């Protein structure tokens, strides 16, 4: 409804759609928690100055 205007603090969130018109659900908006490691460093130094992986 494009003719409806919110009053005061009664604001409705707009539906998020892709360019093709698909509605995005909350689960598709989450950032991925799985990735691929492509490089690693030598490690970090501990209090004694030794490198720990």
Swiss-Prot record:
Pfam families linked to this entry: Cpn10
Keyword Endoplasmic reticulum: no
GO cellular component, one term: mitochondrion
Region (Cpn-10 domain 1): 1-10
Swiss-Prot/TrEMBL keywords: Chaperone, Chloroplast, Plastid, Repeat
Any GO MF annotation of the entry: unfolded protein binding
Disulfide bond positions: none
Renumbered residue ranges of the record's region Cpn-10 domain 2: 11-53
Source species, domain of life: Eukaryota
GO biological process, one term: chaperone cofactor-dependent protein refolding
Location(s), subcellular: Plastid, Chloroplast
Keyword Iron among record annotations: no
Family: Belongs to the GroES chaperonin family.
Subunit structure and binding partners: Forms stable complexes with cpn60 in the presence of ATP. Homotetramer.
Function in brief: Seems to function only as a co-chaperone, along with cpn60, and in certain cases is essential for the discharge of biologically active proteins from cpn60.
Entries under PANTHER family matching the protein: 10 KDA HEAT SHOCK PROTEIN, 20 KDA CHAPERONIN, CHLOROPLASTIC
Designated name of the protein: 20 kDa chaperonin
Source species: Populus euphratica
Lineage: Eukaryota, Viridiplantae, Streptophyta, Embryophyta, Tracheophyta
């Amino acid at each position: 409804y494009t003719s409806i205007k919110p009053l005061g603090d009664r604001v409705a969130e707009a539906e998020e759609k892709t360019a093709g018109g698909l509605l995005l659900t909350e689960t598709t908006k989450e950032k991925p928690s799985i990735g691929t490691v492509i490089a690693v460093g030598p490690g970090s130094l501990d209090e004694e100055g030794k490198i720990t992986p």
